[in-house]
Design a protein with these regions (language model features):
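Bacterial N-terminal signal peptides that target proteins for export
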Residues: 1-7
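Non-catalytic, surface beta->alpha helical segment in thiol-disulfide oxidoreductase systems
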Residues: 182-202
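Conserved helix-turn-beta segment immediately C-terminal to the redox Cys motif
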Residues: 46-47, 55-56, 60-84, 103-107
Length: 202
């Protein structure tokens, strides 16, 4: 009985320590569009805007706004990071090389792009699993475009909103200089809409 109680106390203590462990973006690594390992600890002290992207989406023109933000504020500490993904309407069918060329030629993208990966499901990259565990889905808002997105996804799955994961291309996560997620923005929120919140963190 004593041993069982002792083991129970030890297990509870270990669980408490594990649950209290503070995870930041700096604990993760990813593969770049060029196939190189990216250690996110290298971004310590930066404000990060992490976005899942696609080349053939109605939201693809947001690349313009993302690049504008990056150019305007990179010298003050902002880094925009794109994660191409083909999970939503198969709107990112290209190879990593084709994606890079598309972004550069059509939108002049100079901010970092990661290798194409899943952001939901069994094969989701660990960064996005962590991002949406920190900031779960909380709705598209009351704008006309938000209602349109809600209607579209509800037709496919009436319970879609109960899951914390990514709902569509160009979901954005804003992280502070300590690597913590401070806000999540759904695709209907444009890069221009984020500027004041980004500036507040710089």
């Amino acid at each position: 009985m004593f041993i069982r109680r002792f083991l129970g106390i030890v297990c509870a203590a270990m669980c408490l320590l594990s649950c209290n462990k503070t995870t930041t973006i700096y604990d993760f690594k990813a593969e770049s569009n060029a196939g190189e390992e990216v250690n996110f600890a290298d971004y310590k002290g930066k404000v990060l805007l992490i976005v899942n992207t696609a080349s053939k989406c109605g939201f693809t023109p947001q690349y313009d706004g993302l690049e504008d933000l990056y150019k305007k504020y990179k010298d003050k500490g902002l880094v925009v990071i794109g994660f191409p993904c083909d999970q939503f309407g198969h709107q990112e069918p290209g190879t990593n090389e084709e994606i890079e060329e598309f972004c550069r030629v059509n939108y002049g993208v100079t901010f970092p792009l990661m290798a194409k990966s899943d952001v939901n499901g069994e094969n989701a990259n660990d960064i996005f699993k962590w991002l949406y565990s920190e900031k779960p889905f909380a709705g598209f808002g009351d704008s006309d475009r938000g209602k349109s997105m809600d209607g579209m996804l509800s037709r496919g799955n009436p319970d879609y909103a109960s899951n914390p994961d990514i709902k569509w291309n160009f979901t954005k996560f804003l992280l502070d200089r300590k690597g913590r997620v401070v806000a999540r923005f759904e695709p209907v929120v444009t890069p221009e809409d984020l500027e004041s919140q980004i500036v507040a963190l710089l």
